[in-house]
Structures are given as structure tokens and as C-alpha cells.
């Protein structure tokens, strides 16, 4: 029997949330700190399942680190070069794409014998495009199904001319970019297809720059990385707040504010998901930006029809915010929802219908027509943290909502429901 949490109707949302560290930034920073020369102190590291999987993998690979008691500060002693193992290893990475993809590429730099595996859902998340790009020099075998983890990696990546499909996940390119400077030869990466989630590549390039490596590119179509380089620790690095996690609180304020301020991201943020606030503003919310905060106040929400490929994770929050808009909302160009923690397009359509919405699910879009009155329902979360957090917004109506398996938020935001309760005035 799955545990469940029933949220009673919320009359008002008001207050400030200090955001946990970004998952995307945390796992990239941990890997680069491990590869770099010198010790790096990471501040505001996210404490969640995905980060623990990366930390456990790095420990197995001989990386020393020291975590503070609350696990948000971490001193990482860099290896000054590739990750290697002197014995055969199996690394279990849960359902953490931000650990699986970058580690798969980084482990191709040395000559080890390492198996990367994870939960059942991880074995359904494609990795073939990354493996194809690496196979010019590296030896990689699929242990179960072609194009999917688990993988056996025995190294041998030297750089050179690579081609990678950019249309499924930007994490494949991120993985190649982070490994390439440590290859013996220069690397030139050509993108096939349309590059999805481009702002996530900007996060990668920003982090690499912080660790002393510059990448040149021609309009995100061809990337050039000099080989034979070493990452250098910046000494200290502050992980900014998670912009995807901010989306739930900002949307809640747009629907039932009051005013909510999220701190840890702002005008200078490296995360593309901060653009979520612009989408809310287009829908009618009132947004204020600071250097390290975003503030949202309630507005009459209008329907919207928009390409949201640039904010794939935060766009899910628009799908549930659409329940409170004046007319039908259409979210387009989101095929990559289908290869995330679950098939998010299918899951979102199924659960939105339960609360009374009329939903059209396309191959790469979703259309949501809000009901006159929301219906109380039990929401399946599909072991997907974002499904649980998105559907908490249903409680901003005059209807309670029951979230099944609420603990799945541990992937990125273990105390999400406590934070939501702290800002809520119940009806």
C-alpha cells in the first residue's frame, strides 16, 4: 500500500522560500570538482537522492570528500585527472540521469572495468546517442537492452570528431563536453537534429568556465574543446537555488497569493528554468526580479499557447497552473517529457483528467482545458518527484487533493511539502 498525503484546500500562499541547491548544478559541480586539481568547497549543495547517488559513485572511484552535518556544504579533493578504478566496479545510480550520463562519458577517459546501472526506470531511459558518440574510441557494452543502461565501460576515449543527436536530451552533449578537455586529442562535437533544452548546455559551459576550461561553439551546432587540459578548482563554488523547484511556489503565488519570494536565483541566474517566471507573467501574474530572488504576486491567469522546449522541467508546473487559467492552455515542443523520470506527457494527461480537466495529449504537446470545478482525486506520482509537486497546486482550489507516494520528492526536494505548508493559510 502506497503512502499518501492529503492536502486540504489552501486559501492563501504568502512568504519566502530559501531554495535548495539546483540538482543540475550540484551534480555537474561534484563531477568537475572530482576531476579538478585542488580542493573545492561547494556551498548550498542539494541534499537529495540524485546527489547521494553521485557522491556514492565518486567515493567508490576513490574521490575523498567531507560533507557538513546538513549535507549542503562539501569539500571535494580533486584527482587532477580522470576517474579510474583499480578493480571491477558496479555503480548503482538510482534514477539519476544527471549522474548516469556524465559519469558514462567521464569513465571512458581511463581504462577501468565499470558497470553503471540503476533502478528499473533508468533501464528505460535512452542512452544510445551518447554511447554512439563515444564509441569512436571507447569500449562500451550494453548488458541488457540495446541503447539503454546498464552499461559496461572499459575506457579508451581520446577525443576527435564526434556527432551527437541533440533532439532527445541535452545531457548527452553535457556529458561529452565535461569529459572532452581531459581527452588526449582535441574534440569537435557536431550536433544532429535540433538541440533540446539549450539553457542546460549554458549551465554546463558556465560551470566548465568556473573550473578553468573554455569551450568555443558555432551557434550551438559545432563545439570545439582543446584536449590535454586540466580542470582547476575555483576554491569555492556556490550552487544556486533550484529554478525548477522554484516554479511550484511562484505558480502557487500566481494562483492564490499573497506574494511569494524565492531566494537563491534571480536576474543573474545561470539556469534557464528561471524563464518560467516570464511565462507566469505572460499568463497575468505579477513578477519582480532581484539579483538573487524572484517574487510573484497573484494575477488573473489567462490561457497561453507556447513552445516550452527551453524550460522542460518547469513547463510541467504550467500544466497544473493551467487548471486555474481562463481558457485552454497549450504547451508545445515537449517531446523530451517522454524520456524523463516517467513518460511525463502521458502521466500528466492521465492525472489532469482525474481532477476534471479536458486534456488532449499529442506526441510533443499537451492541451489543457480547465474544468468549472476541480474534482477531489488521488494522484498517482509514477515515482516522479515533479508529478508530486505539480499536483500539490490542486489544493489551491476549494478541493482537497491526495498525493500518492509523496516521499518521491526526495529526488530533488525532500522537505517540499513542509515548505508548502509553512507558506499556506488553509481555507
From Swiss-Prot:
The keyword Signal does not apply. Phosphoenolpyruvate binds at residues 23, 97, 125, 171, 344, 386, 411. GO terms for cellular component: cytoplasm. The keyword Cytoplasm applies. InterPro entries: Enolpyruvate_Tfrase_dom, Enolpyruvate_Tfrase_sf, EPSP_synthase, EPSP_synthase_CS, RNA3'P_cycl/enolpyr_Trfase_a/b. Keywords: Amino-acid biosynthesis, Aromatic amino acid biosynthesis, Cytoplasm, Transferase. GO terms for molecular function: 3-phosphoshikimate 1-carboxyvinyltransferase activity. 3-phosphoshikimate binds at residues 23-24, 28, 169-171, 197, 313, 336, 340. It catalyses: 3-phosphoshikimate + phosphoenolpyruvate = 5-O-(1-carboxyvinyl)-3-phosphoshikimate + phosphate. It is found in: Cytoplasm. It comes from the Bacteria. Pfam families: EPSP_synthase (PF00275). Signal peptide: none annotated. One of its GO terms (biological process) is chorismate biosynthetic process. Its main location: cytoplasm. The active site is at residue 313. Its EC number is 2.5.1.19. Pathway: Metabolic intermediate biosynthesis; chorismate biosynthesis; chorismate from D-erythrose 4-phosphate and phosphoenolpyruvate: step 6/7. Belongs to the EPSP synthase family. Monomer. Catalyzes the transfer of the enolpyruvyl moiety of phosphoenolpyruvate (PEP) to the 5-hydroxyl of shikimate-3-phosphate (S3P) to produce enolpyruvyl shikimate-3-phosphate and inorganic phosphate. This is 3-phosphoshikimate 1-carboxyvinyltransferase.
